[in-house]
A protein has these predicted regions:
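Cap/insert and terminal regions of metallo-dependent hydrolase folds
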Residues: 81, 168, 188-239
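Catalytic cores of nucleotide-enabled group-transfer and carboxylate-activating enzymes in metabolic
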Residues: 2, 16-25, 46, 207, ...
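Catalytic core of the metallo-beta-lactamase
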Residues: 2-6, 20-21, 141-199
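Flavin (primarily FAD) cofactor-binding/catalytic cores of flavoenzymes
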Residues: 13
Length: 239
């Protein structure tokens, strides 16, 4: 098995990882680059693979930096399944349509600006219609349910505690008479939050692809965070 990092490796956004065997190609996430003009330009570039050759996408959650290029993937030839949790499937309908709407409006604004300057209009990265087409390929799966994505790979979604529907992905790949386990963390939540469940503890893996944006930071205890929030509220209302 080969792993190619196609986003979120030298930056925070654009999560997209290509897993390839001799017989299969799948993606873990297909997120949008965000942050400014340089990141926007990355979204316009061709994928470093042929979208038509990708069998499926296994999606960690519905934040745009993890799912936001799915309509572009479909627009450029992908016709496979998009596997995600039930809650993520529900959120995708809102998130992707909203993202398509934003791209349409930004293109309209830039085109009006270009017209005044005598330049050509621009096309949106993708549209609401592209997002609606993408939703046809979504295949919801429950947490903790083992399912096959092809004759070599099996997947389980575990609660990541990040947002509603977020998942840590366990992927088993049978290759050369061996079975290798890859774990993709997606974005991880923290412990003991009042609304979301704690992230699942994964005890064993051969390969780990892990979110590390805040990996070098010490997080305060919940009680400390609550006190800090209360102090901010009191100061704000006292102005």
């Amino acid at each position: 098995m080969k792993i190619k990092f196609c986003g979120a490796a030298t930056g925070v956004t654009g999560s997209c990882h290509l897993l390839s065997t001799e017989n299969h190609k799948i993606l873990l996430d297909c997120g949008q680059f965000q942050g400014g003009k340089a990141q926007d330009a990355l979204n316009e570039e061709p994928f470093p693979f042929d979208p038509a050759e990708i069998e499926c996408v296994v999606l960690s959650h519905a934040h745009i930096d993890h799912c936001g290029r799915l309509p572009l993937l479909v627009k450029r030839g992908f016709r496979g399944a998009i596997y995600c949790t039930d809650a993520t499937a529900d959120l995708l309908e809102v998130m992707l349509k909203d993202s398509g709407f934003i791209h349409e409006k930004e293109a309209e604004w830039q085109s009006r600006k270009n017209e005044r300057a005598g330049r050509k209009p621009v096309e949106p990265l993708y549209t609401v219609k592209d997002s609606e087409e993408t939703l046809k390929y979504v295949r919801p799966v429950m947490y903790d349910q083992l399912f096959e994505i092809n004759d070599e790979m099996k997947v389980v979604f575990n609660d990541a505690g990040h947002i509603l529907g977020s998942a840590i992905i366990e992927l088993w790949t049978a290759e050369d008479d061996n079975v290798y386990k890859t774990v993709f963390s997606g974005d991880l939540g923290v412990l003991d939050r009042p609304i979301l469940r704690d992230p699942t503890i994964i005890k064993k893996a051969d390969y780990v692809i892990m979110e590390s944006t805040y990996g070098n930071r010490l997080h305060p205890e919940n009680a400390t965070s609550i006190e800090q929030l209360l102090d901010i509220v009191i100061k704000t209302t006292g102005r």
